[in-house]
Amino acid sequence: MAIVKCKPTSAGRRHVVKVVNADLHKGKPYAPLLEKNSKNGGRNNNGRITVRHIGGGHKQHYRVVDFKRTKDGIPAKVERLEYDPNRSANIALVLYADGERRYIIAPKGMQAGDVIQSGVDAPIKAGNTLPMRNIPVGSTIHCVELTPGKGAQLARSAGAYAQLVARDGSYVTIRLRSGEMRKVLSEGRATIGEVGNSEHMLRELGKAGASRWRGVRPTVRGVVMNPVDHPHGGGEGRTSGGRHPVSPWGVPTKGYKTRSNKRTDKYIVRRRNK
């Protein structure tokens, strides 16, 4: 893995910083694990924009990633590491002893030829998946299930991890990167180690077009809009908005709490760091 700063051969290359991984597969992905991935431009079934700043971008296939890791007791050999355009982490194509191939999130340090396993008897080794009741306290984990059998939901992006800090009855307590500590059922599964490609955060796209390739459209500031379009809009000449920052719908931003799921509050031991 190397961080490469491009030579300023043009204005669009001047600020580009790339993450280069020579270990990634340079050919086509494994076709049986590809699915159609249609774009919706941030619009719902009524054609209305529900998520702003989405549109365009390069065509992509979805890689079907195994987030459940339920093939217990069957060892799998890592065939290759691959780039995945749908996520910041890299993925690994693994071949199970029974002949089945699956994609998984590639943890830090994984290489082609490694052997991984899942189940209660799997050794404590990066890339192996176990129920959290079988993982030692203090271990670094990723791809954590919130609901047993549903599949991993936490710590899935590049460089992400959580730490298992306590075990209490049918629950374990984990500490997330944000500083939040929460309880999850100990029957849920997690994978040992942290997600690879942690250098992803160091990249610089270098130009607006690189964002457009990724399907990200520009963000227009509210203070340059008209009053009909945004609470900060209007005024004679350049203004500061005249009020505390709000969203286009008048909801305060910059630190305003919007969490409303009181049903799961009891599982949060400590709120995330500010």
Curated annotation (Swiss-Prot):
Could you state one GO cellular component term attached to this entry?
Answer: large ribosomal subunit
Disordered as annotated region, ranges: 223-265
Q: Kindly give the Pfam families that the UniProt entry links to this protein.
A: Ribosomal_L2 (PF00181), Ribosomal_L2_C (PF03947)
Keyword Repeat found: no
Which Gene Ontology terms cover its molecular function? rRNA binding; structural constituent of ribosome; transferase activity
Keywords, sorted A to Z: Ribonucleoprotein, Ribosomal protein, RNA-binding, rRNA-binding
Ribonucleoprotein keyword on record:
yes
List the InterPro entries. NA-bd_OB-fold, Rib_uL2_dom2, Ribosomal_uL2, Ribosomal_uL2_bac/org-type, Ribosomal_uL2_C, Ribosomal_uL2_CS, Ribosomal_uL2_dom3, Ribosomal_uL2_RNA-bd_dom
Q: Which GO terms describe its biological process?
A: cytoplasmic translation
Q: What is the recorded function of this protein according to its Swiss-Prot or TrEMBL entry?
A: One of the primary rRNA binding proteins. Required for association of the 30S and 50S subunits to form the 70S ribosome, for tRNA binding and peptide bond formation. It has been suggested to have peptidyltransferase activity; this is somewhat controversial. Makes several contacts with the 16S rRNA in the 70S ribosome.
Subunit structure of this entry?
Answer: Part of the 50S ribosomal subunit. Forms a bridge to the 30S subunit in the 70S ribosome.
NCBIfam families recorded for this chain?
Answer: rplB_bact (TIGR01171)
Concerning PANTHER family, the annotation shows:
LARGE RIBOSOMAL SUBUNIT PROTEIN UL2M, RIBOSOMAL PROTEIN L2
Q: Which family does it belong to?
A: Belongs to the universal ribosomal protein uL2 family.
Q: Which HAMAP family match?
A: Ribosomal_uL2_B
Task: Write down what this protein is called.
Answer: Large ribosomal subunit protein uL2
The species this protein belongs to is Vibrio vulnificus (strain YJ016)
